[in-house]
């Protein structure tokens, strides 16, 4: 997987955490760089860690499904993208507080990184530099989560829906790209 594709994937995965971070920032009465940093650290670490777990899960059964591995990658990415698009249009308002306590953040970090676990499974079937992939995912998630807190505090929740839509579309496009390359319809562009 090329650097551009990994970068695009990392941005797509980070959109869920960005949206939650916007809500966190919205809930803050006073902007706190420390809270934004803690928020970004939780999300970045979990988004980077889950693909590693997914990768090793995928490796464990890769030999059994090598003939359909690209179809699995396609289905997982498209499913996650559609799920993210659906969530973008649910009329759920930001329902979080500004707490960065362990119990609050661990639940949010796990909930927003399940898609990263699924993407990690797809990494087992693709030519991916795992260290580079998880580093990009973690760093980009960390930075976008911190930015989300700031934007949420300054502008409110108006970017939440856009972020989730962008993330969903990116995951769907990557799913189709993987499938079309495997079928020989699309030469590796990126």
Curated annotation (Swiss-Prot):
One cellular-component annotation, GO: plasma membrane
Signal peptide from the UniProt entry: none
Keywords for this protein: Cell membrane, Ion transport, Manganese, Membrane, Transmembrane, Transmembrane helix, Transport
Disulfide bonds: none
GO molecular function, one term: manganese ion transmembrane transporter activity
InterPro entries: Mntp/YtaF, Put_MntP
Protein name: Putative manganese efflux pump MntP
Organism: Lachnoclostridium phytofermentans (strain ATCC 700394 / DSM 18823 / ISDg) (Clostridium phytofermentans)
């Amino acid at each position: 997987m090329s650097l551009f594709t990994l970068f695009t994937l990392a941005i797509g995965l980070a959109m869920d955490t960005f949206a939650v971070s916007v809500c966190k920032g919205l809930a803050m009465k006073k902007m706190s760089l420390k809270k934004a940093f803690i928020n970004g650290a939780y999300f970045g670490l979990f988004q980077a860690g889950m693909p590693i777990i997914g990768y090793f899960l995928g490796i464990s059964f890769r030999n059994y499904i090598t003939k359909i591995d690209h179809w699995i990658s396609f289905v997982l990415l498209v499913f996650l993208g559609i799920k993210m698009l659906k969530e973008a249009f649910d009329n759920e308002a930001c329902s979080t507080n500004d707490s960065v306590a362990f119990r609050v953040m661990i639940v949010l970090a796990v909930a927003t990184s399940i898609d990263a676990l699924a993407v990690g499974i797809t990494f087992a079937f693709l030519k991916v530099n795992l260290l580079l992939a998880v580093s990009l995912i973690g760093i980009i998630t960390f930075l976008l989560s911190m930015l989300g807190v700031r934007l949420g505090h300054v502008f409110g929740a108006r970017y939440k829906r856009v972020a989730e839509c962008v993330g969903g579309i990116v995951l769907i496009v990557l799913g189709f790209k993987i499938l079309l390359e495997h079928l020989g319809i699309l030469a590796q562009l990126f």
